Structure formats: structure tokens, C-alpha cells
């Protein structure tokens, strides 16, 4: 696979697809969009799918990226449809050149929406999704995707007894526990009662009960 890297005047960001021993990861202006240290991007996506448990029906993938999570979800026979949303057209352009993202554009169970998840989620009906995967960029890059307003929308579009995987990463010392506490506090304010941390996936599993 030839190296993919470029600067976008429209976004003012540098984009780079970085090879690993398995699936490549995306880097935007020096910030990795995938875990690539203790686990590779392929294993990272697999751990997220494992953490959310048995999935079926219709699934929302809030931030497409290179499409790895959407692809693994759509591979499951119990999943009927994966709706995945990506704001950055440059990311989709890179995904189209990444052979490991090919099923994102070829699997008929995957519906890709080019748009802002913060706005697109408002267009879905109440209790539309059985499961949601929310893997946003860092909070300082996309703070609106960690907001109470967005969490209320997640609650609204999720079916009763549905689950959400919310990737939170491993916050630095300066953020510390207050970062996770803030997320959990806003999720509870949005209506979610059952929230647990799954360390191996660096994610919260949230149930609507």
C-alpha cells in the first residue's frame, strides 16, 4: 500500500495513513485516531465489539473514521443494518484508498452518511437503534459529542434495553478522573442509569433500562 499523506486547506489539517502489522491507523495533525501502542487498530476494533456484547438489529456508529468498527458490526449475521456517520470528507477519501476499509463501501448492510453526528442524530426517530457505538475524537477536538445535549439525543434514539459503547480512552494526568466523572455525570443527567467501565476497551458500556 502506497503512503497516503496530505494537507487540506479546507480544514487546515494534515492527514496521514500510517501502516502497522495489521490494519493502518489514521493520524490527523499529529493526533492518532486509533489505539496503536499496546494494541493495533484491528485488535482495538475487535475489543470494542467484544465489550458491547451480543449485537443485533440496527446499529448506529457515530464516528466512522476508517470504518473498522462499522465493518466488524456488519459482519455479524444478527445485525441487519449499520448506519455510520462521518463529518470529515478527507477521512472518507482516505478510507476509499485503504484496502482494509473496502467493505465500508461494498457491504450493503452499511449506510454511510457524510455529515455532523451532532446534527444528523436529530433526524432519527425515537428508539430507532438497538445499539450505538460512540467513538468520538478527543474531547478538546469535538467537545459537542461529549455534551449533555448530544447524550440526550443518544438516549432518545436508543431502544429500551439497548446498549451504547462510548470510547473514552485513557485520560492524561491533567484530565484525570474528573474527565471520566464529567462524562458519567452528563450521561446520568441524560437519563442513563447503568454505566460501567470496561478497561480492556477503554470504553464505557451504557444501558438504557
What residues fall within each predicted segment?
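S-adenosyl-L-methionine
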Residues: 87-126
Amino acid at each position: 500500500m502506497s503512503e497516503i499523506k496530505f494537507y487540506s486547506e479546507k480544514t487546515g489539517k494534515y492527514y496521514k495513513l500510517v501502516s502497522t502489522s495489521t490494519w493502518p491507523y489514521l493520524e490527523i495533525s499529529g493526533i492518532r485516531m486509533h489505539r496503536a501502542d499496546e494494541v493495533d487498530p484491528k485488535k482495538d476494533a475487535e475489543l470494542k465489539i467484544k465489550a458491547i456484547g451480543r449485537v443485533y438489529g440496527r446499529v448506529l456508529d457515530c464516528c466512522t473514521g476508517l470504518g473498522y468498527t462499522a465493518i466488524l458490526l456488519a459482519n455479524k449475521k444478527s445485525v441487519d443494518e449499520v448506519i455510520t456517520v462521518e463529518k470529515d470528507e478527507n477521512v472518507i477519501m482516505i478510507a476509499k484508498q485503504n484496502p482494509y476499509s473496502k467493505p465500508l463501501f461494498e457491504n450493503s448492510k452499511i449506510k454511510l452518511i457524510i455529515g455532523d453526528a451532532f446534527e444528523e442524530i436529530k433526524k432519527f426517530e425515537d428508539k430507532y437503534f438497538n445499539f450505538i457505538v460512540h467513538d468520538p475524537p478527543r474531547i478538546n477536538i469535538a467537545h459537542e459529542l461529549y455534551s449533555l445535549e448530544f447524550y440526550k439525543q443518544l438516549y432518545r434514539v436508543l431502544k429500551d434495553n439497548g446498549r451504547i459503547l462510548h470510547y473514552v480512552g485513557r485520560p492524561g494526568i491533567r484530565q484525570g478522573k474528573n474527565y471520566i466523572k464529567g462524562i458519567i455525570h452528563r450521561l446520568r443527567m441524560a437519563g442513563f442509569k447503568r454505566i460501567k467501565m470496561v478497561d480492556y476497551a477503554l470504553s464505557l458500556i451504557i444501558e438504557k433500562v
